Amino acid sequence: MAASPVDAMRLSPLPILLALVASAPLRAQVEPAVDPLAPAPSSAVPLEEIRRFAEVFRTVQEGYVDPIDDRTLMQSAVRALLADLDPHSAYLPATSASELAEDVQGMYDGIGVEVEVRPDRSLKVIGAIDGGPAHKAGLRTGDVIVAIDGRPAGSLRDADPSRALRGTAGTSVRLSLLRPGEALPRDVVLVRQSIALSSVSGRLLEPGYGYLRIGYFEGDTADELKRQLAALQVASGGPLSGLVLDLRNNPGGLLTTAVEVADLFLEGGPIVSTRGRTAASNVLYRAAAGDALQGAPIAVLLDVGTASSAEVVAGALRDQRRALLLGARSFGKGSVQTVVDLGNGDALKLTTARYHTPAGRSIQAAGILPDVTLPGTAIRGLREQDLPTHLAGDAEVPDGYATGVIVEGESAVAEALRRVKQAAAARQATARRATSAG
């Protein structure tokens, strides 16, 4: 069995709220990190418990009222083994594993929505992919899909009810949505399309000041970011004086890609460390020399939809005093998942580490507070700590302060630009004084 270096664009329970490990080469430096409090992994096999499991398996196999094949029974057992661990560990049967691998290629057929499977098997919308059918139809973070094509989501027999959202491009699907604050569901019909996953977009806000949005972190996000940054510099007629980096509603992706993105804007120092029970899970990532903006100020936008790898970038830039954070407290997913190939087409997605920001903070179930709070829409039940069986955090937010805030619209971009211009003006004044003194 081998760990698979794949991204997680799978539309399933918290589909891309992941910081998946990958083996892609990094410009950043990678060092082993040791967690002195982590217990050593045990290789002991609990023989008595395994005998008990075998007895239960045989009893069900032989005596259940209806015949049940061994593979189905074993898959159920493996799912149950992972069910009580944490919401991001999961068993992926071959169909789900192949869909995950398909998503890594940057293209899939569906409606372009990220969802969380709730205990009643309804689907809570985490975010809609820019330009996809769900985004065009106005699906919002916090909407709950209670029925698909007239069938209650709880009645769908598939282990992952979100698979019903997928289908051949050009086919339609009818969703019943329950929106927060509304008593009755609304129906909306969407036409599936081939979703080309472009993770970065950008534009020039005004001469010298750029805007880059990262929708998620996949294999070539850092390269896309470099291309967009170069295009902005050409459009501006030279190096940028400042940048607004928008990570709102970014549910995460590859940890190694997040490291590459943070590394673009840092001259050195730590980016993130991961701490788990195995040697492979304990890693410190450091930035290599070379800041793509040459120190020009950065403002980062975040909200409750900013999760996992996006939180890695925000935390690294803030702890290194490289960026000002604006918006609302982030989601609070501070764990790393590894995908393990089981050799028969099935796979195991297992939480193997917590990550820590350069200042040593774990954001698990706590999130990252912005430096400047912006107004938004408050909705309860959207954060990591609201998920059943979530990993305990070092500094979880008390329930009374756990409301998630969605920060939408261009007013947030305008405020971020104003702050960046202030910082750029101060930087230029400092440079003039230094030149005058010299």
Report each predicted region and the residues it spans.
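PDZ/PDZ-like peptide-tail recognition elements
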Residues: 76, 88-127
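Conserved PDZ fold ligand-binding element
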Residues: 61, 134-156, 243-246
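C-terminal "post-core" interaction segments
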Residues: 30-33, 51, 200-438
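PDZ domains, with a preference for the canonical peptide-binding region formed by the helix
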Residues: 144-176, 257, 333-339
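Terminal peptide-recognition signature
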Residues: 56, 77, 113, 134, ...
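Terminal targeting/pro-maturation regions of precursor/exported proteins
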Residues: 26-91, 124, 412, 419, ...
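PDZ-domain C-terminal substructure recognizer with occasional recognition of PDZ-binding tails
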Residues: 124, 146, 160-201, 351
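Bacterial N-terminal signal peptides
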Residues: 12-24
